[in-house]
Amino acid sequence: MFAFFQSHLRPIVFWTACVLLTFFCLTRFGDVSAQLPGPILISREDSTRAIAYDSVTHQREPFTATAPIKFGSDPATRIMVFAMNLTLQRDEAITAVTADAEDANHNVLSLTVEHVGTVPDQPWATSIVLRLDEQLGDVGDVLVRIKYQGAISNRVRVGIGHVGGGLADDEGAVPTPGREISIAPPPPKATNLTATDVQTLIAQAASAATSLGHPVTIIITDREANVLGFFPMSGSPATSTVRSVGTLGRGLEGASVMAFQAATAKAVTAAFFSTHGNAFSTRTAGFIIQEHFPPGISFRPGGPLYGVQFSSLGCGDINRVNGKLGLSGDPGGLPIYKNGEPAGGIGIEGDGLYTVDRDPTDNDQPFEELIAASALRGFEAPAQIRADNILVDGIRLPYSNVVNPPAPPTIPFGSLVGAFLIFPPAGPPDSQFTPAVVGGISGEVSTRFFPFIAGTAPAGNTLTAAEVNTIISHAAQQANITRAAIRQPLGSNARVTMAVVDSEGVVLGVFRQQDAPIFGYDVAVQKARTAAFFSSATAGARLRAAGFGSYVDRALADGLRLDGSVAFTDRANGFLHRPFFPDGIENTAAGPFSTPISEWSPFNDGLQLDIIKTNLVSVITPPFGPLFTCTSIPGLANGIQIFPGSVPLYKNGVLVGAIGISGDGVDQDDLIGAAGANGFSPAPAIRSDQVFVRGVRLPFLKFPRSPNL
């Protein structure tokens, strides 16, 4: 169950055939000649040295007993080894597998088995994570074996402290080979774009804009929202006006924003939404955030990512990005791919209007999208993974209305008047993410939120660091076998970010699977905080104290006290945030946390925007204040999120936090969150699906059909 054996971490070269060789164990370990064939630990082709990796850093031996990167609640190193002839039965615990190691002095130390799982695409191979005994010093080679159902494996060599020395191989021991497993290290940088690439993209965009007669602002970002190139063409508008539908002057409708902020939001959105398995544009984003899905079709529920535009905000404390505005649904942002690899995004702003496409049927081709498409010649997304090859609920997503982008002669970059390039002089920025393995699943963490920590509440009413690790591990293991909704090729597993917070919204741990879309990093925390906040005993009081008592009163009118008596998931909370209640049903009143449909717009959706509006405006208008909280409400520093993918967590009947999931289909997010929450779920009697509002049962969770691969 290791995701690094899949997707973009290929070229992982796994053996294609294994030669099962007869071997014998020493008599001192018991006669196993009458046993059925036991597990076989896999070694190199030329020796009995194990195929083994540090499960966090992916480094090869020699290993230290104390981990170079601390994992969980203890400093011990975890290593991965691999076996054949080992498959746990359904519902069989990993305790069925044991392991030990013998050093040169014949000291035999038990090794804790922490994970046993099938290697994806190699059902005959099993990965095993072992925690080294901290008593192991610089002992050199030890002989490691495992036991399962009375059967004892061969012993393989593992170097501790240094390689060499140790006991001689067991009598009759031979290599149990396969072709070398080579785990490719993750890209050390946030992009593979060079300064020349950025110059080419800007020159192609500026040339297209010149040929169309529309000067624009051009922004190039890497995958993690670092701005690599900024070029405001002479004569391009300096500002844009936020305008969609609804009442002018309400929410952000009518607000003036800087053109470079709008362009950056577009580039960031395209970069954050795109991976090796899907390429989404800002047109895609605008399609999935409106009051109906598809937009304009009555009596359809809201978009699956309704509310995502208010994430990755410049005022937040999680994913602090240069865009400030959050995510964009305004056409003109496209992902950049280099040699088929996701590398960043381009954003074009120049029409003076920051909006969303309210009519996806008119096949409009705004010049901003034309220019972005022209700029990407040579940097296009692979056709197979574009949004228009991905269906959600049977609905094909849009990508770009530009079929044949303009291709005028390119003006040399050096001849572009006023060009301003901010490509970092030291080269591409380092990634904020570090490789890590949690629950046997390969992914990435930020050192800001790793190692995982315990909750901040008094002892006994909080999550321990070990429990946080268990929750995230269970979620990651479920994600690794969950059929993805938005990835190509079909049959890929979901790739998500998992976040756990305590009851006060303090982040206890965040884990991102390899190639999970980066927008989910901020959103997962938002979802977790939202579930913890609205399930708390003080939610109503804190909202009222912050000046949002009108929403509390509307909830009370619907029988919702916001006093901790109901365990709210984000699916339930989002249901209450829709401009129609029930969701999508025309001619009904708005949910208690939404604005009325007569005033509603994607830039004025109710409580979600209102609690962040003051601080958001302060970072998008001069002097662009450097805030690190979006609200005045404790526990909601990066705002709230209102589409599914979170579960509140309880321990001994007490709210101790929440888990948030983001990165794939919302039903998949719910399923993965439920797996993480297993053992910490709310009592059935207080779940949101036991509550009726206006005669309508609130939802709790919704799982996809046949979810597992």
Question: Which residues are covered by each model-predicted region?
Answer:
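Short, proline-centered helix/strand-breaking motifs
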Residues: 32, 127-134, 334-335, 647-648
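Flexible, solvent-exposed loop/hinge segments and secondary-structure transition points
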Residues: 183-709
